[in-house]
């Protein structure tokens, strides 16, 4: 089964290199993208298994990943490395994410039309086999829970809600890395990737 961590061939190759490094430090790779542009940017999202990664930890990951990439040298052009947390309205890139975030609202986009639509918004209801379950509004019956095969997904992301913010606060307090000032203006940033811990870019 595929995942949404790394989509393209070069992304998957890079993920194969950096995943052991990140996991060896006690973190998880959430998403990796090599972005095009005048200078290419390697964007890495990482997190603790129980959530709550902070800027200093992103910096540690950046240093370790840089060293590994310097040895393997998979990117021929100059590039900038960015390591960040997934943010509050985080992407859902692995099948297990849909179990972890059961009960929270999400937006899902599929690669092909499913019953005439590609976009689904609703409450996550876990997984069943290789299917993601989501409860969506149904004009006739109120609400209905449908199953979408994980391999059909093009993108999936949590929706910023008060319940989600409360859970992120709980995770940060539990991790011992809680800084209340980071959450002062979250409600004003609804719909954006608020509270994203990010290490300043590193050029290569």
UniProtKB/Swiss-Prot annotation:
Membrane spanning stretches: none
Spell out the Acidic residues composition-biased ranges.
181-198
Q: What's this chain's function? A: Required for maturation of 30S ribosomal subunits.
Principal localization reads: cytoplasm
The superkingdom listed in its UniProt entry is Bacteria
Report the family membership.
Belongs to the RimP family.
GO CC list: cytosol
Q: What is this protein called?
A: Ribosome maturation factor RimP
Q: Which Gene3D superfamilies match?
A: Ribosome maturation factor RimP, C-terminal domain (2.30.30.180), RimP-like superfamily, N-terminal (3.30.300.70)
In terms of HAMAP family, this protein maps to: RimP
Q: Which InterPro entries match?
A: Ribosome_maturation_RimP, RimP_C, RimP_C_sf, RimP_N, RimP_N_sf
Gene Ontology biological-process annotations: ribosomal small subunit assembly; translation
Question: Which gene is transcribed and translated to give this protein?
Answer: rimP
Which terms are listed as keywords in the entry?
A: Cytoplasm, Ribosome biogenesis
Compartment(s) where it occurs, according to its Swiss-Prot or TrEMBL record:
Cytoplasm
